[in-house]
Amino acid sequence: IITASADPQWAAGIALRASVVATGQACQSIERVYVARAIAEPFLAALAEGARGVRPAFPPGEGGELGPFIFPPQAAKVQAQIDDALAKGARLLAGGTVERLGGGYYLAPTVLADVTSDMAVMREETFGPVIPVTIFADIAEAIALANASDYGLAAAVLAGSIAEAAAIAPLLEAGAVSLQDGALTSIVSDAPN
């Protein structure tokens, strides 16, 4: 959940990192983003710009930040979720197509706006670098949307202050709630190579 008081550029950076860590295949990757209407457009613009800057790590040894899917059938499942969302009216802001490069399947970070609860990407576990974004009117709506998921291993709250984030966290039905960061990814990012 990203509140109206959060800086949209800052929140976009965290949402991107938390959604694509380990190609979105980490158990605590953020799979759904709920952003306040007041900051939605600058947030979406920053998120899409950041996503377009992430490169596949192919060919090996030539840089890049994003690896392949670990299980080829997962690439097909994720592509089907993207296609379902687009067919039902989602807007594609970045990414969107799985590519076969060498022996692996890669997907650039995919940003979907205007997603709805009837889309597979919002109902199912994605396990890929897809960032579906729903805009909410007030924090009660955001909490209801977040808690409507069958999944709840991890959640995150980004706000203008730690106090605001901490007030929202106990209302979320999740095993772990990160405040001002994305689902414990700072631990992964700070780990030595």
Where does each model-flagged region fall?
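ALDH superfamily catalytic-core signature
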Residues: I1-T116, L145, L179
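Conserved C-terminal structural/oligomerization subdomain of aldehyde/semialdehyde dehydrogenase
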Residues: I1, A6, E99, Y106-N193
